[in-house]
A protein has these predicted regions:
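Acidic helix N-cap motif at the loop->helix transition within catalytic regions
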Residues: 14-18, 35-46, 86
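Conserved short acidic donor-positioning loop in nucleotide-sugar-dependent glycosyltransferases
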Residues: 30-35, 56
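Active-site acidic Asp-centered loop
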Residues: 32, 77-80
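Glycine-rich, basic loop-to-helix element that forms the pyrophosphate-binding segment
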Residues: 53-69
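Short aromatic/hydrophobic "clamp" motif used to bind/position activated sugar donors
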Residues: 74
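A recurrent flexible, glycine/aromatic-enriched loop bordering the glycosyltransferase active site
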Residues: 123-143, 155-158
């Protein structure tokens, strides 16, 4: 099983950003800026595909990354997330332990100002409590998202 990280960023120097984030998997990085171009490189054995796009909106950025995702699993991320060593392996293990799940939420250590809900055990998330979880905690089966044509709404901010 292979995981791909989908990063949304705004006006970043992408090579230093990718290094800082400690990306431990192939990555699609959407950098919203003032130009349209593509670049690709390898970092620590992982393919980084970067799309510089002259557009704005985090939902649009996540949708662009999701459309290009081609791994078994994908994990949404923001430019200020720094992954602990072993994070990718733990996410893959979570899906192996729960083959019935199309999406799993994972705790991600973030700056105190961004701290949000913290899960202490496995449970099903429902429509009435899903809003408490940040997008960067979502890992999902890419094929299921593509099969159901699921995307982020562009009608309001925040992704």
């Amino acid at each position: 099983m292979k995981l791909q990280i989908l990063v949304s960023s705004l006006n970043q120097e992408v090579k230093s950003l990718a290094e800082k984030m400690n990306l431990q998997a192939d990555t699609i990085l959407i950098n919203q800026c003032n130009e349209n171009r593509y670049e690709e490189w390898t970092q620590d054995g992982h393919q980084i595909r970067c799309y510089h796009l002259a557009e704005r909106g985090v939902g649009l950025s996540r949708n662009n990354a999701l459309l290009r995702a081609d791994a078994d699993l994908c994990l949404f991320s923001d430019e200020d997330i720094v992954y602990d060593d072993g994070a990718v392996e733990r996410i893959i293990e979570g899906f192996e332990q729960h083959p019935e799940a199309d999406m799993l939420l994972f705790n991600v250590r973030v700056q105190e100002s961004r701290f949000t809900y913290w899960n202490s055990f496995y449970k099903r998330v429902r429509w009435y409590n899903c809003g408490r979880y940040p997008a960067y905690s979502f890992a999902l089966r890419t094929a299921k998202m593509h099969e159901k044509n699921l995307t982020y709404s562009l009608l309001f901010g925040g992704g």
